[in-house]
């Protein structure tokens, strides 16, 4: 009824859709012309020091991808893990190898949903833009989930100008080609942050995120794909951004 064109299935606490219910959701989404994405559970750490937690993390991503695919979803995003005080290069290799298990399993199952590690909001979390883009270059069916508020929070207030937003988009195109901008999964929200990064999400008008300049950059680069509002007032900010975007020349 709001006229919005996308929705994210939130599996952040648990995968709350059964495989029996999924086809019904797919049918409704198709009839309503809505693109679905999915956010896998928060309880994921592909760099855990405990093998059981790594296995559980892999299973959570796989099961999210399976249900999301049955729902007809476009992509599944997730927070990959934590550095755990280790060398980032070592962490990268560990997470990459565990993601290979995910991508090879889904390939065997003929599940072609996009697997999307997300840019994260804290320095302790794996997932700066270079790490996510490198994973996307090196792994089958992997593309970034680009959370612009997380860039802003992770750097304690940087990445908040047209030039900086454009720089991110230029980097994506340089690393992934035009496809990187044509197949985007984006999160936008207001955000509270401090020296350690993200604290919590805010409504856009209550935050300092320069979202109008971000929307202008997305328009100028002719970005395509899906943009998801993660503000507390999800629909209000989604409509706000849509209306501003449509008004851009």
Regions found by a protein language model. Name each.
Residues 22-26, 61, 65, 96-103, ...:
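Generic structural signal for well-ordered alpha-helices
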Residues 30, 47-146:
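Active-site acidic/histidine proton-transfer and metal-coordination neighborhood
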Residues 10-21, 45-48, 83-86, 122-127, ...:
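Acidic-and-aromatic substrate-binding clefts and catalytic sites of carbohydrate-active enzymes
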Residues 101-197:
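Acidic/histidine-rich catalytic cores of soluble enzymes
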Residues 1-3, 32, 74, 92, ...:
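A structural signal for the main folded, soluble domain(s) of proteins
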Residues 1-3, 16-37, 64-72, 103-110, ...:
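Acidic (Asp/Glu)-rich catalytic clusters
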Residues 235-249:
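C-terminal helical cap(s) of enzyme catalytic domains, especially alpha/beta-barrels
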